[in-house]
């Protein structure tokens, strides 16, 4: 009953010569997906070596504001609860204290709200923050590096994680975080990132080395940096309201928090987000291979 989906790029009516992203789907999905540019072929006719799982489930929310962002950060992150069941975390920056404030909880037996609501007073006075619901890594992580201090959250699936782990260890790097006894993907991504001379260069280094998928939000003392996976496999949506911007995995949170959808971040695009505006650090790629499971499995129905 299983079929293979291929999302191909076309050049003057002919398939472009490039690798394709492939995912599994049920036979019943064939009709609805073929109408949006997917090609359905029998699984047994294809080599299984080309199959790439899109991502571990997870969703993030980040906001920068002229005023306190605590309520938006709390509820915005909670709106991603359908995307993960194991870990939840928030990090915010307090300008007056010049400090990052972080909280991480296990969600396997409790809901996000019941875990985080008692600790919200710690975040009072913060005007920027990021949050994550994750099925694997404990995050956000707060890093101190030559690029400055920053917090990071990721929605990622790294296929070559063992190869990258060995490469970094050979460079005398070390890993301090473990997730279920394995290397924390977010820490590995942070180590690749800080090899760059700038945040943009560091994120491009991540794009160049990671096989699989990786979208991220970085929280700095100057706002948020949003970077979508190079192939666009997982989305980032930008919203805005008076005096504030938000970046999130799905748009379902915007209506109840007073945001309007501003734009969709493109594949490989990098944006620096401040309360007064958005700066593009890297232009988007021309081709996108978004994960089709957003529509048929784990995406929230009201998200665009």
Model-derived regions, located:
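Polybasic, lysine-rich low-complexity intrinsically disordered segments
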Residues: 7, 17-18, 27
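Short, Lys/Arg-enriched N-terminal segments with co-localized hydrophobic residues
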Residues: 38-56
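Conserved short alpha-helical segments that host acidic/polar catalytic motifs at enzyme active sites
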Residues: 52-267, 272-304
